[in-house]
Amino acid sequence: MQQNQKIRIRLKAFDYRLIDQSAAEIVETAKRTGAIVKGPVPLPTRIQRFDVLRSPHVNKTSRDQFEIRTHQRLMDIVDPTDKTVDALMKLDLPAGVDVEIKLQ
């Protein structure tokens, strides 16, 4: 690969344990192939809250509150080798983790 190239990986998940486990797998794989890893950096957790009326007819003041928490991690792999890219492509991550990869 070219000099001064880096791979930016952004992970998103609803479960923080899954995202931490996936980040550890990615870091271990990249370090094993000789790349320099910066991160994982925890990004702010996005919290979506929903208020729903409990009653179908009256009692407007009685509501249920639900929330969805989206956890995010960011990591950079500096000067990746071809071995690093191949190892990351073969990596099997859990289904609940969204992986976004950018080459810079």
From Swiss-Prot:
It comes from the Bacteria. One of its GO terms (cellular component) is ribosome. One of its GO terms (molecular function) is structural constituent of ribosome. One of its GO terms (biological process) is translation. The keyword Cell inner membrane does not apply. Belongs to the universal ribosomal protein uS10 family. This is Small ribosomal subunit protein uS10. It comes from Ralstonia nicotianae (strain ATCC BAA-1114 / GMI1000) (Ralstonia solanacearum). The gene is rpsJ.
